[in-house]
Every structure is written in structure tokens, then in C-alpha cells.
């Protein structure tokens, strides 16, 4: 007994019922509040496909991640042979220089780190001395504060002794 209704028929029924209710409401409100209906405005955003997400089951990228490397290689292949050899030699020299400098840089970094570590140790010892000095000052202040009392305190002490 249940009838199968197609989506188009159902959509048309829905739109007609909405338009009837809007017309009825507009008739109650009068001509002042008439505005362009939402059907004419077409407020609904167009449906777009969702971009693929990362994670389990995600599709791979179409472009390779090293596309800039491949483009450089393609440019290098398209050059004349003499220029190609010259550029390759320059790249090899650059790599060799980086290897040599890499060892030097490593030693330089070790030296710099050792210097920084020594400076930090010196600063730490200086702050420890300052902490000791400040503790000594605080204890001497508290002793002086106890020794110095107002005149009223003296009368309090005398009053306690008389009783």
C-alpha cells in the first residue's frame, strides 16, 4: 500500500506548500513586508564535492612531492650539452664545498656551545653568590627589627614586669 514517491515529485510538493504558506503570511502582513522570496534569491549554495581528507584510506596526491626537483631536472635536460656539463660541474663543486664546510661548521658549533655553556655556568655561580648575600641581608634586617622597637613597646614590657 505504500507508494514509492520520486524525489522530484516530493520536492515539487514541498516547494508548493512553502509558497502557499508564504503567500498566506504575506497576505496577513500586508504589502509593506513583501520581499523577494528565497526561491528567487536562490540562497542555497551550490553543492560542491568535498576535498579528499588526510588519514587512513586517503588518496595519494596527483603530483609528486618533489615536483620542483623534477622540474629542475627537466630544465637541465633541455639545455645544450656544453651548458649542461658546466652546470653539473658547478653543482658538484657546491656539494663538495658543503661537505668540507660541514665538518668545519660542526667543530665551530661545538666550540660555540662550549663557550655558551661556560658563560651559563659563570652566571649561575654569580646568581648563587647573590642569593647567599640576599639571605644574609634578610636575616640581619630581622635581627635589627627585633632590636629596634618603638617607645610604646618599651612601656608594654614595663607594664608586664610590674604585674
UniProtKB/Swiss-Prot annotation:
Chief location: nucleus
Compositionally skewed regions (Basic and acidic residues) per UniProt: 88-118
Gene Ontology CC annotations of this record: nucleolus; nucleus
Phosphoserine modification, residue list: 125
Location in or out of the cell: Nucleus, Nucleolus
Sequence intervals crossing the membrane: none
Keywords associated with the record: Nucleus, Phosphoprotein
Disulfide bonds: none
Residue spans of biased composition, Acidic residues class: 119-133
Name of the protein: Uncharacterized protein PB1E7.01c
Amino acid at each position: 500500500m505504500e507508494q514509492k514517491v520520486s524525489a522530484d515529485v516530493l520536492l515539487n510538493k514541498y516547494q508548493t506548500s512553502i509558497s502557499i504558506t508564504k503567500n498566506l503570511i504575506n497576505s496577513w502582513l500586508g504589502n509593506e513586508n513583501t520581499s523577494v522570496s528565497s526561491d528567487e534569491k536562490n540562497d542555497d549554495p551550490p553543492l560542491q564535492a568535498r576535498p579528499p581528507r588526510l588519514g587512513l584510506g586517503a588518496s595519494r596526491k596527483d603530483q609528486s612531492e618533489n615536483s620542483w626537483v623534477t622540474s629542475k631536472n627537466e630544465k637541465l635536460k633541455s639545455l645544450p650539452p656544453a651548458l649542461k656539463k658546466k652546470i653539473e660541474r658547478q653543482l658538484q663543486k657546491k656539494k663538495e664545498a658543503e661537505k668540507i664546510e660541514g665538518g668545519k661548521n660542526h667543530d665551530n658549533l661545538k666550540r660555540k656551545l662550549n663557550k655558551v655553556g661556560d658563560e651559563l655556568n659563570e652566571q649561575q655561580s654569580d646568581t648563587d653568590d647573590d642569593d647567599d648575600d640576599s639571605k644574609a641581608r634578610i636575616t640581619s634586617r630581622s635581627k635589627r627589627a627585633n632590636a629596634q622597637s618603638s617607645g610604646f613597646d618599651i612601656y608594654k614590657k614595663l607594664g608586664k614586669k610590674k604585674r
